[in-house]
Amino acid sequence: MHCLRAIVKGKVQGVYFRDFTRTQATRLGLCGYAKNLANGAEVEVVAEGDKDALLEFLNLLRSGPPRAEVKDVETGWETATANYSDFRIKH
């Protein structure tokens, strides 16, 4: 199992980005969370699962849902914790 941490930047709040993220992560069998950051222009995403699924997920994060305008995605790979049983939207 692998863990992807991403900060997605751009017009990603108020455009259903977190819901899109949860839908795609669930479809790919990933666990973790998506959370709006306080600056209003970034979403933090942590996802754990199969590396191939995570790479596909990362490509989806780069495009986002139709109303989003993704400018940049900062990524890092971490040690998976297996602390997540599903994919959630954090508030």
From Swiss-Prot:
Domain Acylphosphatase-like: 3-91
Matches recorded under SUPFAM superfamilies: Acylphosphatase/BLUF domain-like
Alphabetical keyword list: Hydrolase
Any GO MF annotation of the entry: acylphosphatase activity
One Pfam family named in its UniProt record: Acylphosphatase
InterPro entries, alphabetized: Acylphosphatase-like_dom, Acylphosphatase-like_dom_sf, Acylphosphatase_CS
Protein's recorded name: Acylphosphatase
Family, as annotated: Belongs to the acylphosphatase family.
EC number in record: 3.6.1.7
The keyword Transferase is assigned to this record: no
Active site (record annotation): 18, 36
Catalytic activity, as annotated: an acyl phosphate + H2O = a carboxylate + phosphate + H(+)
The organism's place on the tree of life at top rank: Bacteria
